[in-house]
Every structure is written in structure tokens, then in C-alpha cells.
Regions:
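Charged DNA-binding/catalytic regions of mobile-element recombinases
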Residues: 1-247
Length: 247
């Protein structure tokens, strides 16, 4: 049995983290505690979490039907497959916000989140090119059959850069499960938590959330590492044979 003062200190830190991360459950909070050097059994953290009344309230799904996600083949390296999609939101005055989300299916990194009032196929191609200049071009991009993604501009961009476009079947969002999962987190932890009054404000807030998502947020599919941490380890592992060859 842990002394009361230890439980009190752990609970206090747990409450503080939960207030900073309003949409995190106990598993992610436990990962943050571990990262800080506080090593506590996850069952103990769960008990203190419940006793402190910190359980995250589940938001109702907009669509009443539960859909089972299809199992997608997991890529084996960064830049093997990127997934792209749109998430819609609005400013306080009702004007539409369109967010282009780009995710690396292997590292789970949010490659970019582009925010504007309107985004055409040519705009999508330009933003992918901007991301690729920094990260390298992906081998393939998975997307739905929206008009921006089936446009001549994106098709020409993909052909020119040796990128395969993988179009999912119409009406089958589960075939794009990796980015559907990301979009759910983006809406729950960012869009639903903020009230945007201008496009500039939305861009600043969303860029900050994306950075935090990549660099700090523990990801369950990556053994609670952040995407950036996981990606850095992958790059280091991939670089080892190349270094040895030149010795």
C-alpha cells in the first residue's frame, strides 16, 4: 500500500495534467507521468484517476451508426503511404473553414494541416509539394474520391513526382481508417475545444495543436511514444547500416 502523501502528490499531478489535457484518458496521462520520471503502476493511476473524478466524458457521435474500421495493411517505413482528407469547421460568424489533413500512415505524424476558406485540387497539389520538399515525396497517397482529390491538377502532380494515388471506394471511409482516426482526435481535442473568430487565429491554434500532437502527445499505436519520437528512432535505425558501410 502506498503512503497517503505519495498518493496525494500523484493525484495532484494527475489532476494538473488532466486540466492541461482535457481530452486525455488515464492511459495517456500515465504515459506523460512516466515521461516526467514518475513511475507508477497503471492500475494505481487508473484508481486515483477515477477517485479524482477525472474520467473524460465521451462526446456523442454525429452519426448514430457504429461502423467497424477495416484493417489496413500497415506500411513498413516513413513516406511509404500518406493519407489525406478534409475536415470541415466554421468561424464564429458562420464562414466555412476547410482543413486539409495529411498523415504519414507509418509514423502517425501529422505531416501538415492546411486551413483555409476554400481548397482546390491545385491548392492540394501545392501543399503536398511543400510538405514533400521538407520530408521527401511519399510512394503513395491514399484518399477518397472527392473532386479535389480526383482533379487533373493532383493527378498531374502525382504522375510528375512518381506518387501512386490510392483512391478508396466511394462511400467507404473505413478504407481510409488511419486518417479517419486522426481526424476524430483533431476534432475532439482541437476543433471542439476552441471558438475561432478569424482564419488567422484558427491557423495559429491548429498549428500549435499539430506541433503538440507530433512532439508530445502519446500515441497508443506507437506504444505511447509521440509520433516525432517514433519517427526519430526509425530514422536513426535506418541510418545505422549506411554509417557502417563507410567505416
Amino acid at each position: 500500500v502506498q503512503p497517503d502523501h505519495e498518493n496525494e502528490a500523484l493525484t495532484a499531478r494527475l489532476v494538473a495534467l488532466a486540466h492541461e489535457r482535457r481530452r486525455f484518458g488515464y492511459r495517456r496521462l500515465h504515459a506523460l507521468l512516466e515521461r516526467e520520471g514518475t513511475h507508477a503502476n497503471h492500475k494505481r493511476v487508473h484508481r486515483l484517476y477515477r477517485e479524482a473524478g477525472l474520467a473524460v466524458r465521451r462526446r456523442r457521435r454525429r452519426h448514430g451508426v457504429m461502423v467497424e474500421r477495416e484493417q489496413l495493411a500497415l506500411p513498413s517505413a516513413p513516406n511509404e503511404v500518406w493519407s489525406i482528407d478534409f475536415v470541415m469547421d466554421a468561424l464564429s460568424n458562420g464562414r466555412r473553414l476547410k482543413c486539409l489533413t495529411i498523415v504519414d500512415d507509418f509514423t502517425k505524424e501529422a505531416v501538415d494541416i492546411v486551413v483555409d476558406h476554400g481548397i482546390s485540387g491545385l491548392y492540394v497539389a501545392r501543399m503536398l509539394d511543400r510538405a514533400a520538399r521538407f520530408r521527401g515525396y511519399p510512394k503513395a497517397i491514399r484518399t477518397d474520391q472527392g473532386p479535389e482529390f480526383t482533379s487533373r491538377a493532383l493527378d498531374q502532380w502525382a504522375y510528375a513526382n512518381g506518387v501512386t494515388l490510392k483512391l478508396i471506394q466511394a462511400g467507404k471511409p473505413t478504407q481510409n481508417a488511419y486518417i479517419e482516426s486522426f481526424n476524430g482526435k483533431f476534432r475532439d481535442e482541437c476543433l471542439n475545444e476552441h471558438w475561432f473568430t478569424t482564419l488567422a487565429q484558427a491557423r495559429v491554434v491548429i498549428a500549435a495543436w499539430r506541433q503538440d500532437y507530433n512532439e508530445a502527445r502519446p500515441h497508443s499505436a506507437l506504444n505511447y511514444q509521440s509520433p516525432a519520437e517514433f519517427a526519430a528512432k526509425q530514422r536513426a535505425t535506418a541510418a545505422v547500416p549506411a554509417v557502417q558501410e563507410h567505416v
